[in-house]
From Swiss-Prot:
Gene3D superfamilies: Ribosomal protein L13. This is Large ribosomal subunit protein uL13c. GO terms for biological process: negative regulation of translation; translation. GO terms for molecular function: mRNA binding; structural constituent of ribosome. Belongs to the universal ribosomal protein uL13 family. Transmembrane segments: none annotated. Its main location: plastid. The lineage of its organism: Eukaryota, Rhodophyta, Florideophyceae, Rhodymeniophycidae, Gracilariales. InterPro entries: Ribosomal_uL13, Ribosomal_uL13_bac-type, Ribosomal_uL13_CS, Ribosomal_uL13_sf. Part of the 50S ribosomal subunit. The keyword Amino-acid biosynthesis does not apply. Keywords: Chloroplast, Plastid, Ribonucleoprotein, Ribosomal protein. One of its GO terms (cellular component) is ribonucleoprotein complex. The gene is rpl13. The keyword Chloroplast applies.
Length: 143
């Protein structure tokens, strides 16, 4: 009887830093979601957390194509009658610049316990300043 091969778990974490300045929202989000998931690893296993941490800087200067900067809307509902809140992309970018990337990347991760663990490994900052220098992150540049 053959046994299923299980990839060995990592005991160390890998830190990456990504600059979001002038990058397209969707393209960057999908690449980050793939990295968090560990799909770039040769030992990818769907149910294993690969302990990859990503620091995303300059989220304030994310780019979108077309008229999405003024036309794209984000909706949330309180659950009460008349509780629908609608905000435009540029309003959210001015108030909470991290929220746009958080919402985009979280939607691309698995729904469940693993997805919540992976999302906690994403650190987003609106400017260049971040408190993770001691982790010595590797710089990743996307074209």
């Amino acid at each position: 009887m053959n046994k299923t091969y299980l990839a060995p778990t990592k005991n160390y974490s890998t830190w990456y830093i990504i600059d979001a300045k002038n990058k397209n929202l969707g393209r960057l989000s999908s690449k980050i979601a793939k990295l968090l998931r560990g799909k770039n690893s040769i030992s990818f296993t769907p149910y294993v957390n690969n302990k990859i941490y990503i620091i995303l800087i300059n989220s304030r200067s994310i780019n979108v194509t077309g008229k999405k900067f003024v036309q794209k809307t984000y909706k949330r509902h309180s659950g009460y009658p008349g509780g629908l809140k609608v905000q435009k992309f540029n309003e959210i970018l001015n108030q909470r610049p991290n929220r746009i990337l958080e919402k985009s990347i979280k939607g691309m991760l698995p729904k469940g316990i693993l997805g919540r663990q992976l999302f906690r490994q994403l650190k987003i900052y609106p400017d260049n300043i971040h408190p993770h220098e001691s982790q010595q992150p590797k710089i990743i540049t996307f074209i």
